[in-house]
Amino acid sequence: MSYCRQEGKDRIIFVTKEDHETPSSAELVADDPNDPYEEHGLILPNGDINWNCPCLGGMASGPCGEQFKSAFSCFHYSTEDIKGSDCIDQFRAMQECMQKYPDLYPQDEEEEEEAKPVEPVEETADTKASAAKEQGASS
């Protein structure tokens, strides 16, 4: 015997094996694309940018939020052949702002490693032998 039980906000439905064997008669309700409580991705159904998308990692807020929005909007709406090539000034302004707040906008480790001077590598006996062999072969 199947039955339904409400627990707080949840509704628990117990069904029998026979209930599962018959096709469902439930009708699906189409999602409302304009539902303000529905979570959306980066681009809203109307094509606008969803500044509240968690995928932006909070970049749209904070001390450089306006510069980020300006650069990102320019890129999103760019119609140039090389998309965003008309947005260099906006991206430069965003970068300059972010450099003022290194604690909030840390640079990638890869960039930091590239900026470090390269330390000389100690030569091992193997590399000296290889160099001597090459020098002897070229003589």
UniProtKB/Swiss-Prot annotation:
Residues 106-124 have a biased composition (Acidic residues). Transmembrane segments: none annotated. Residues 104-139 are annotated as: Disordered. The keyword Transport applies. A motif (Cx9C motif 1) lies at residues 64-74. It comes from Rattus norvegicus (Rat). It comes from the Eukaryota. This is Mitochondrial intermembrane space import and assembly protein 40.
